[in-house]
Amino acid sequence: MLKMNLANLQLFAHKKGGGSTSNGRDSESKRLGAKAADGQTVTGGSILYRQRGTHIYPGANVGRGGDDTLFAKVEGVVRFERKGRDKKQVSVYPIAK
C-alpha cells in the first residue's frame, strides 16, 4: 500500500497589511484677513478685518468685536493707516454729501 504525505498547506498574505498613522487630518481654515479693501465704500456694520488678537487696531468709526473682528460703525470709505512706527489701524471716513 502506497502512503502519501499530504503537505501542510499554509497561505500567507502577498501584501503587507496597511499600518495606521496619527497624521492625515487638518482643521478647517478660519477665513481670517481683510474683508474690505483700502478705498472701498462700506455700510455700517460691515466686517472690515477678521483676526486673532490685534494685528490691526480700530481707528475712527471702527469697532472691535469680542473675537477681535473689526467692523464699520458708519457708512463711508475704508482707509488702512499706520499707527505710530510699528502698528496699523483701519478707519472709516464718512462720505461728504
Swiss-Prot record:
Keywords: Ribonucleoprotein, Ribosomal protein. It holds the Pfam family Ribosomal_L27. One of its GO terms (molecular function) is structural constituent of ribosome. GO terms for cellular component: cytosolic large ribosomal subunit. SUPFAM superfamilies: Ribosomal L27 protein-like (SSF110324). It comes from the Bacteria. Residues 14-38 are annotated as: Disordered. One of its GO terms (biological process) is translation. The N-terminus is cleaved by ribosomal processing cysteine protease Prp. InterPro entries: Ribosomal_bL27 (IPR001684), Ribosomal_bL27_CS (IPR018261). Residues 1-12 form a propeptide. Belongs to the bacterial ribosomal protein bL27 family. This is Large ribosomal subunit protein bL27. It comes from Streptococcus mutans serotype c (strain ATCC 700610 / UA159). The gene is rpmA.
